[in-house]
Amino acid sequence: MKDNNIKLSLLMKSVEQPLMKTELPEIKVGDTIRLGLLVKEGSKTREQLCEGVVLSRKKRKSLNTSLTLRCSFQGVGVERVFFLNSPRVTFVKVIRRAKVRRAKLYYLRDLLGKASRLKQIFN
């Protein structure tokens, strides 16, 4: 049984490897990123920019790698989940890094204004 699981995981890795994006920067929880997303409206396709704080990250080295991004549109906080290896994601750029001591920053949902700021890391 164990040998079958090992063979299956190797098969999955060999199938996923060509589909994964290699030019993605290192993204950590707490980073402020700008993400380009292809949006189809009718017959036209345009690129939509989304900028916000990364609240969580799941499955780091997999085809299903996703992150939860908290943006604010017109004064309202919006959270979206993005799959990083999706063909709809055109680019990811890290704008600012922050020092955080948690793996998930869900507590930022309840904070307003200056309280929701994170301590910035200067490189």
From Swiss-Prot:
Its main location: plastid. It comes from the Eukaryota. It is found in: Plastid, Chloroplast. GO terms for biological process: translation. InterPro entries: Ribosomal_bL19, Ribosomal_bL19_CS, Ribosomal_bL19_sf, Translation_prot_SH3-like_sf. PROSITE patterns: RIBOSOMAL_L19. Keywords: Chloroplast, Plastid, Ribonucleoprotein, Ribosomal protein. SUPFAM superfamilies: Translation proteins SH3-like domain. PANTHER family: LARGE RIBOSOMAL SUBUNIT PROTEIN BL19M, RIBOSOMAL PROTEIN L19. This is Large ribosomal subunit protein bL19c. It comes from Porphyra purpurea. The gene is rpl19.
